[in-house]
UniProtKB/Swiss-Prot annotation:
Belongs to the universal ribosomal protein uL18 family. GO terms for cellular component: cytosolic large ribosomal subunit. It holds the Pfam family Ribosomal_L18p. GO terms for molecular function: 5S rRNA binding; structural constituent of ribosome. Part of the 50S ribosomal subunit; part of the 5S rRNA/L5/L18/L25 subcomplex. Contacts the 5S and 23S rRNAs. This is Large ribosomal subunit protein uL18. It comes from the Bacteria. This is one of the proteins that bind and probably mediate the attachment of the 5S RNA into the large ribosomal subunit, where it forms part of the central protuberance. It comes from Paraburkholderia phymatum (strain DSM 17167 / CIP 108236 / LMG 21445 / STM815). Keywords: Ribonucleoprotein, Ribosomal protein, RNA-binding, rRNA-binding. InterPro entries: Ribosomal_uL18_bac-type, Ribosomal_uL18_bac/euk. One of its GO terms (biological process) is translation.
Length: 121
């Protein structure tokens, strides 16, 4: 089993447990250059809010700072944006789905920023 298969196996187990809880899910995906966050409905079929480093507003803000979307500063910005969008959609608490990635670095920065912005998990 390689690294990718191991990560996907961990992600699948997490999603099964979150589905049993029937709560909104904050899913995070990271690549070398970007980070993405989506809030899914409790049934898991609808995306209620999303934010990523590909958005034009985010890219403009990052151009002032570092110019890249694959760093902790970008993840912090995405965490704040996803929390604001989720709260605007009426979502106060979510289950955090790290998609099998380690809770470290950019994933942790996104989660901490979302918590500071008022999202509960």
């Amino acid at each position: 089993m390689d690294k990718t298969q191991s990560r996907l196996r961990r992600a699948r187990q997490t999603r099964i447990k979150i589905a049993e809880l029937q709560v909104a899910r904050l899913a995070v995906h990271r690549t070398n250059t970007h980070i993405y966050a989506q809030v899914f409905s409790p049934c898991g079929t609808k995306v209620l809010a999303s934010a990523s480093t590909l958005e034009a507003e985010v890219r403009a803000q990052l151009a002032d700072k570092s110019g890249k979307g694959g760093n902790v500063a970008a993840a912090t910005l995405i965490g704040k944006r996803i929390a604001e969008k989720a709260k605007a959609a009426g979502i106060e608490s979510v289950a955090f789905d790290r998609s099998g990635f380690r809770y470290h670095g950019r994933v942790k920065a996104l989660a901490d920023a979302a918590r500071e912005a008022g999202l509960k998990f």
